[in-house]
Amino acid sequence: MSEPRFVCLSLGSNLGNRFKNLQIARTLLGEQAVLGLRSSVILETEALLLPGSPPEWDLPYFNSVLVGETTLSLRELLVTIKQIEKVVGRAEESPPWSPRTIDVDILLYGDESFCCDHTEITIPLSNLLSRPFLIALIASLCPYRRFCTQGSPYHNFTFGELAHHLPSPPGMIRRSLSPDTMLMGVVNVTNDSMSDGGMFLDPEKAVAQAEKLFTEGAAVIDFGAQATNPKVKQFLSVDQEWERLEPVLRLLKETWSNRKQYPIISLDTFYPEIILRAMDIYPIQWINDVSGGSQSMAEVARDCELSLVMNHSSSLPVDPKNILSFSVPIGEQLLSWGEKQLKMFSDVGLNANQVIFDPGIGFGKGAAQSLATLYEIAKFKRLGCPILIGHSRKSFLSLFGNHDPKDRDWETVGLSILLQQQGVDYLRVHNVAAHQKALSVAACEACAPI
């Protein structure tokens, strides 16, 4: 095995679920090619197109930069990258400059003076200086590394210097996004939600809200027609819940079916029948089951090949008196419950990679217990599945002040930063725009320069 060498890669995506595309590519690169992988933030940029390109190619990109070390030769690394691009879904014969599910480029390789000019690859990347957003991302990770290309007016400049001299033109960068923690945006098709009840009962308003959340940076959109807050004493029947959801899903099918960029669509329900009906209309991908995931729901997830969010709850409807023990650490109780659920799911044939763990903030927990749960993420990671936290605007935030639920976004964002630092995979939130701004800046701590 050869000695590890420095490597710097760029990831780009402007087709499909761009968050998931970057995430899958990054994971595979870390497993197969790059040691000690570190990621920049994600920058959404306008597409760079040649004059006369089809207008349907003009789709914004998500871009990020990865640095680390590799024991692969340049040729071996290139072959591995092509294989990973294929796994993520890139078409083999896509025209140059056309939209793509994933694009992985080798920007830098080896020591600073290493150069390569071959028909298959050029190091440093031949058009790197015309991609100022990539220069800025490299500078965020390794500002003191030098750009070495004989004959270039920028030869021997550090990337920090390059970023200073070659800033992105106005309008090129749309925004920055967190590279690690993805957001689930909430659309409550209810009249009795604590924070926005009645706002999105109309199907057009519900779909418009989903569009807004996606535009603001949600990787997942969670539609729910059944409120489960403590004030709800009786749930809707299957038919009543479906009466609210069906027109939303039909409008979603009408307006979103041919989209080139899209989020994961999730349904917040504990009725398996709702999922089966929904699958006949729109290809949802997640089930968000606040009951914790019954055997029948696990079987539906298995048969339909959907992801299942198992949300811990002590009772439904929520009973404030039915809460977890105060004498046993909250993390241990939730970990034990999660292990039992995963065992049951495994017994019915649901793969572990289809399960997402939600400790259920506010479900069967007092306010102090809910807050304590947010500090137990490392323990929950023992389950081996992604972690989702739904703390947005919930009543336990009254510990920080007696505010109306819709006015709890800043408390929510503050705790979301804490959760991102602990490696939470998904956050279920109402205010996506505020979260993306805060989390992308907070992510800079994890990608501090070396």
Curated annotation (Swiss-Prot):
Recorded GO molecular functions are: 2-amino-4-hydroxy-6-hydroxymethyldihydropteridine diphosphokinase activity; ATP binding; dihydropteroate synthase activity; kinase activity; metal ion binding
GO cellular component assignments: cytosol
Region of interest (DHPS), residue spans = 183-450
Q: Which PROSITE patterns match?
A: DHPS_1, DHPS_2, PTERIN_BINDING
Annotated (7,8-dihydropterin-6-yl)methyl diphosphate binding lies at 228, 268, 288, 358, 394, 428-430
The GO biological-process annotations, alphabetized, read as: folic acid biosynthetic process; tetrahydrofolate biosynthetic process
Task: Name any one Pfam family assigned in the record.
Answer: HPPK
Q: According to the UniProt record, where is the region HPPK?
A: 1-166
Name the chemical reaction catalysed here. 6-hydroxymethyl-7,8-dihydropterin + ATP = (7,8-dihydropterin-6-yl)methyl diphosphate + AMP + H(+); (7,8-dihydropterin-6-yl)methyl diphosphate + 4-aminobenzoate = 7,8-dihydropteroate + diphosphate
- What region holds the Pterin-binding domain? 181-440
Keyword Ligase included in the entry's annotation: no
The record's annotation in InterPro entries points to: DHP_synth-like (IPR045031), DHP_synth_dom (IPR006390), Dihydropteroate_synth-like_sf (IPR011005), Hppk (IPR000550), Hppk_sf (IPR035907), Pterin-binding_dom (IPR000489)
PANTHER family per record:
FOLATE SYNTHESIS PROTEINS (PTHR20941), FOLIC ACID SYNTHESIS PROTEIN FOL1 (PTHR20941:SF1)
What name does UniProt use for this protein?
Answer: Folate synthesis bifunctional protein
- The gene it comes from is folKP
